Design a protein with these regions (language model features):
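Bacterial Sec-dependent N-terminal signal peptides
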Residues: 1-42, 130
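Short, ordered, surface-exposed loop/turn motifs in non-cytosolic proteins
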Residues: 39-58, 174-178
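Short, acidic Ser/Thr/Gly-rich low-complexity loop/linker segments typical of extracellular
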Residues: 57-71
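A short, solvent-exposed beta-strand micro-motif common in secreted/extracellular proteins
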Residues: 77-95
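Structured interaction patches on ligand/partner-binding surfaces of diverse proteins
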Residues: 89-131
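A structural motif detector for short, solvent-exposed N-terminal "entry" segments of globular domains
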Residues: 133-190, 281-294, 300-318, 381-383, ...
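Solvent-exposed beta-edge/loop recognition patches
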Residues: 202-406, 416
Length: 417
């Protein structure tokens, strides 16, 4: 979810025994999770005494790695697990671990080492490898995405209250003028799978269906621990018989709707710049209620309007929908939202964002939306050096985000001290 220093994309599971579903309730004698260091790490010295978390349904287990980054787990109940790990290192530690070959992008920022495997079947004794990546912590993160929408008191779908929120993790005011917000390609049948992107673009780009920009001609400072609220309709939606919606009149920016049947816009709220939309008739944020709502933040001095566009894979069409190819190196933060499935949960194979941008995904509980659910970052149990609240950012949205029907804009969980 941050600017990536280096990562190998493959997350592999090495199975050492056959699956035996007939004995699926008997605890396994031995399961091993092995951390695989990023290529620039000179050895495994930073992989010892790290916490591995295994989640399945309503149970969570943890294990500690040995000096070589290997965790042995006894008496593990056979199940389908999400396995993850993450820890922080300083920029000087990163330089030391890489023998000076890896240079952090900013000495002011710490870095996060992380890795994740989703829906890993463990029904027999085996060794599971988790490929690690390293990413630089960012000042500004995506902290809320409200795409689900709701229904009003007449049981009619109410879409107007969708919004995004950003949060400043740093102890300094940050001028976000000129910051870009990208909405990721979200077709029912993917325009490009990650495998397609690997084949044609060597994992170097992300497909965007829309690009917006915070106006660059006016200073726009976010206070330490402050938020930025970006909406489609900056009105008080609670007055429209929509009890699960919010008062958005205090929004910082509004994506103005210029369609023939527009949402109500607020002339008192500044316009978000629209740079590109895959449909000329859609000028506001096209957040899909079904959950295919990947969002990225990126920064560049390049002329974004000149960037290459592509038709769906294998890009042989001459007309139709086109997506902008965003160079991955400019991405500061990214959150993968996927549709939920009642029986299996989100389908990780539908990911649009590389694991080094977001190792997993977040999602609402509902499978179709219209429930007033918002995905939002958890509050960390740590404070900033200046004493303000921090949000969890481990480069893994499955770990970093919660879901709520009641939390309000600019509001986050409080952690007891």
């Amino acid at each position: 979810m941050r600017k990536t220093i280096y990562c190998l994309l493959s997350l592999t599971a090495m199975l050492s025994a056959c699956v035996d579903y007939e004995d699926a309730t008997k605890p396994l004698q031995q399961t091993t999770v092995r951390l695989v260091k990023p290529e620039l790490f000179t050895d495994n010295s930073n992989l010892g005494n790290r916490t591995i978390t295994l989640k399945a349904d309503n149970k969570t287990l943890t294990a500690q790695t040995d000096a070589n980054g290997v965790a042995s787990i006894s008496e593990l109940t056979p199940d389908v697990y999400t396995i993850s790990t993450a820890w922080s290192i300083t920029s000087s530690e990163y330089s030391s671990i890489t023998g000076g070959k890896g240079q952090a992008l900013s000495s002011a920022h710490d870095l996060t080492v992380s890795g994740s495997l989703a829906k890993q079947e463990i029904f027999a004794e085996q060794t599971v490898d988790i490929q690690l990546s390293v990413s630089e912590d960012q000042d500004i993160v995506i902290s809320k995405i409200y795409y689900a929408t709701s229904k009003d008191e007449n049981n009619k779908i109410y879409r107007a209250g969708q919004y995004l929120e950003l949060f400043n993790q740093s102890d300094n005011s940050v001028d976000v003028a000129g910051l870009y917000i990208g909405l990721v390609e979200a077709e029912g049948i993917q325009a490009y799978t990650l495998e397609n992107l690997h084949e044609q673009y060597a994992d170097s780009v992300v497909l965007l269906k829309q690009i917006f920009r915070i106006p660059k001609d006016t200073i726009c400072k976010m206070a330490p621990g402050g938020t930025l609220l970006i909406v489609n309709s900056a009105i008080d939606h609670t007055k429209n018989n929509a009890p699960m919606e919010h008062d958005l009149t205090g929004a910082d920016f509004e994506a103005k709707d210029t369609s023939k049947n527009p949402l109500t816009n607020n002339p008192e709220v500044p316009a978000l710049d629209l740079i590109y939309s895959y449909y000329s008739t859609i000028s506001n944020m096209n957040l899909l209620t079904n959950g295919l709502c990947g969002v990225v933040l990126f920064q560049t001095d390049e002329d974004v309007t000149s960037w290459e566009k592509t038709y769906k894979y294998p890009n042989t069409a001459t007309s139709g929908t086109q997506w902008v190819l965003l160079p991955k190196r400019y991405i500061l933060d990214g959150v993968e939202c996927l549709s939920n499935r009642a029986d299996t949960g989100p389908d990780i194979s539908k990911k649009r964002l590389y694991p080094e941008i977001d190792a997993s995904c977040t999602h609402i509980v509902a499978t179709t939306g219209y429930t007033g659910e918002v995905v939002y970052r958890k509050t960390s149990d740590k404070k900033s050096a200046g004493g303000h609240k921090l949000l969890v950012d481990t480069n893994n949205s499955a770990n970093d985000f919660n879901v709520s029907k009641t939390i309000s804009p600019r509001e986050y969980d409080e952690v007891e001290e």
